[in-house]
């Protein structure tokens, strides 16, 4: 985590004030019952999805507090709301993102810092290819038979929450594909 600290400090030195922090790094590894998870996969998800997000925030937040302004946007997932089979660890990490964001909002309530959690559903990116350790065929099946969200949809959501007036704080935004009812309740065309 020392590298995270160094990178964040370099950013603060080069740009001065960070007005918007988007904690977007996240991954899932595997889709298996908890007892069958590879330890490395489990620890990598915790390190990336929870510890990495917290450490970046820890480095950037003090400058926001000093300036009494900023917006922290943390990428959660519908998996953090609706756990599904084979994703106990991933779901837990994304639930942690939501709970951390809520706590951070409470800790900064006396400031003009906003904290938003965006919780996307199924988005067609390289996420599934990473989850299945590079297996492109397995990853492609995740998106078959439905019109998944696209990265641009999530980028537009980020822009939307940042463009609100000072008096408006969007605490949570959940975005799902039209054929998605919960994290893994998805209608697929045959």
Where are the regions that the model predicts?
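Residue(s) in the substrate-gating loop at a strand-loop-helix junction
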Residues: 77
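The beta1-alpha1 cofactor-binding region of Rossmann-like NAD(H)/NADP(H)-dependent oxidoreductases
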Residues: 1-6, 39
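Active-site loop immediately N-terminal to the catalytic Tyr-X3-Lys motif
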Residues: 35, 84-88
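Active-site-adjacent segment of SDR/Rossmann-fold oxidoreductases
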Residues: 82, 103-113
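C-terminal helical subdomain
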Residues: 117-121, 137-184
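Substrate-binding pocket helix/loop in short-chain dehydrogenase/reductase
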Residues: 32-34, 38-43
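Active-site helix of classical SDR
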Residues: 57, 93
């Amino acid at each position: 985590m020392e590298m995270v600290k160094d990178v964040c400090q370099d950013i603060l030195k080069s740009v001065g004030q960070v007005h918007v922090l988007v904690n977007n790094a996240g991954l899932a590894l595997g889709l298996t019952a908890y007892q069958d998870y590879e330890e490395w996969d489990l620890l990598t998800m915790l390190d990336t999805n929870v510890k990495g997000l917290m450490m970046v925030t820890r480095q950037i937040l003090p400058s926001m507090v000093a300036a009494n302004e900023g917006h922290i946007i943390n990428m959660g997932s519908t998996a953090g709301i609706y756990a599904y089979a084979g994703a106990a660890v991933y779901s837990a990490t994304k639930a942690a993102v939501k709970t951390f964001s809520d706590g951070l909002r409470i800790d900064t309530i006396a400031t003009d810092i906003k904290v938003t959690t965006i919780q996307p559903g199924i988005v067609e990116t390289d996420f599934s290819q990473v989850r299945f350790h590079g297996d492109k065929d397995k990853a492609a099946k995740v998106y078959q038979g439905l019109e998944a969200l696209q990265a641009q949809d999530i980028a537009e959501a980020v822009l939307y929450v940042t463009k609100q007036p000072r008096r408006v704080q969007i605490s949570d935004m959940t975005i799902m594909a039209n054929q998605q009812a919960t994290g893994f309740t998805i209608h697929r065309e045959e």
